[in-house]
Amino acid sequence: QVIQTRPLDGGAWEDVSGARVPTHRPLRVQLPSGRPFHVFVFHGPLSRDAAFAGILSSGERLLDTARGALDGIPEPSGMVLLASDGETFGHHQRGAESSLAEALLRCRLSGLARVTHLEEVLDQLPATHEARVASPSAWSCAHGVGRWSRNCSCRMSHHDGWNQEWRAPLRSAVVSLRDRVFSLVERHGDGLIRDPWQALEEY
């Protein structure tokens, strides 16, 4: 998603598309409004291995793979961010939650790294570079936001004849249903709810 970076104090933009995006510290993105917004880029190889390569089969294997990612950090105070769906742990991969707990314990006892959260990282490791992000884009799809509306080729299995052509008509049906519901809320909601739109937003 990040396509270019440059130092905060100015200079030329550097192309970081592909696998060259710096992932060891946050990046600052300037929104169209002029307000700054910080982004964190997850460690691609480590995150993919957690999802697909079986490293969550044991805490030791997860920690060994994470150690390799940590060794690649260009500065001692940098971070490594593993991004994964929460349902990976115990749903997609049975026992992965136990492996994660074991890896976190081993990490703490060995002093290899400190487990933290992104707010603390941003506080202690401020951005030194600003970034430009491809638009539109989604972290879970290499084709922009196509996986939510069309046959973008992202799929669970690569069986012959399988595709996602159903996405466009499904999206159209959901949008049509949304518009119909909005129409009904506008027509009948005032007599039932003090503020129908606020109720919808707070639902």
What residues fall within each predicted segment?
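Nucleic acid-machinery interaction/catalytic patches
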Residues: T5
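Active-site-adjacent loop/helix micro-motif of nuclease/hydrolase catalytic cores
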Residues: A51
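Active-site and substrate-binding clefts of carbohydrate-active enzymes
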Residues: W13-S47, I55-Y203
